[in-house]
């Protein structure tokens, strides 16, 4: 018998991160049974982490993770955990590959043992950004440790799906991402030749929730919006968030890591919102939950 969404048990790894906490909030609002795993004790006091639904666990300890999965027996595990590009230089190379590469492959193995579906979040940074409009079958060619480690972590066996994308969104206690950094500035440069096709964390959460009720069981898929320059994106955020930040155009950085998301849309019939709608929705949602 197919489980209704009200009874599906979801375990989110990296629940305190930019995507993880947004996904946790959104899935809880849709009445899924959600637990999160993170390492940050101070996050546990957040209002939306209630009723012991947040577990404090070091994801480097695979044996403890396996015991947790065995105890909770989730229907889905969604891996939002990872050492991010902005912080990769702070970590030993072995740890980067342990978390970004070994962990998702181990979870893929465990999905067979414990009979859960596994959704892993990858990145457009598996590509060098010289071409743009990358399709799923384009060979990954990143030159840095972050991109290489994420490419090695992409899984696609039975009941394992990798979603390759890029995100912007609000964070809990940090400002590692573009959005939180930008909102604290008075004057910035916006790169007119730096393109990407990411999603807001709220939009990606909506996509993942829809995917939980689709018959898509394996593979690597690009999740992509319409390509936009970093300059255009900052201008849009500036307007919608009613800021008065001075944005100076620059052509100094030239890179195009945009993804082609047509295959995912064809397979699932899930359509990605426009950038304007995504930013408006993100702003409204952040005001609502806070």
Each PLM stretch: what is its role?
Residues 207-210, 214-262:
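Mid/C-terminal beta-alpha module of Rossmann-like enzyme folds, strongest
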């Amino acid at each position: 018998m197919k489980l209704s969404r009200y009874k599906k048990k979801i375990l989110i790894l990296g629940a305190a991160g930019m995507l993880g906490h947004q996904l946790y909030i959104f899935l809880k609002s849709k009445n899924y049974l959600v637990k999160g795993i993170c390492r940050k004790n101070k996050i546990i006091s957040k209002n939306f982490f209630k009723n012991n639904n947040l577990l404090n666990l070091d994801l480097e300890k695979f044996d403890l993770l396996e015991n947790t999965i065995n105890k909770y027996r989730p229907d889905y595990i969604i891996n939002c955990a990872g050492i991010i590009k902005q912080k990769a230089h702070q970590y030993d190379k072995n740890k980067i590959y342990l978390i970004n590469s070994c962990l998702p492959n181990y979870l893929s193995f465990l999905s067979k043992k414990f009979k859960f579906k596994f959704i892993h979040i990858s990145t457009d940074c598996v590509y060098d950004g010289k071409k743009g409009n990358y399709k799923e079958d384009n060979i990954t060619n990143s030159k840095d440790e972050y991109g290489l480690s994420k490419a090695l972590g992409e899984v696609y066996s039975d009941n394992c799906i990798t979603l390759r994308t890029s995100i912007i969104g609000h964070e809990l206690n940090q400002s590692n991402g573009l959005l939180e950094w930008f909102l604290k500035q008075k004057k910035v440069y916006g790169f007119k030749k730096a393109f990407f096709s990411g999603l807001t964390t709220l939009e990606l959460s909506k996509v993942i929730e829809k995917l939980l009720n689709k018959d898509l069981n394996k593979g690597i898929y690009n999740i992509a919006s319409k390509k936009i320059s970093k300059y255009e994106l900052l201008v849009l955020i500036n307007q919608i968030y009613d800021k008065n930040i001075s944005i100076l155009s620059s052509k100094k950085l030239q890179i195009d890591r945009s993804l082609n998301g047509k295959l995912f849309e064809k397979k699932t019939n899930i359509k990605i919102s426009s950038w304007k709608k995504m930013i408006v929705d993100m702003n409204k949602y952040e005001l609502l939950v806070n």
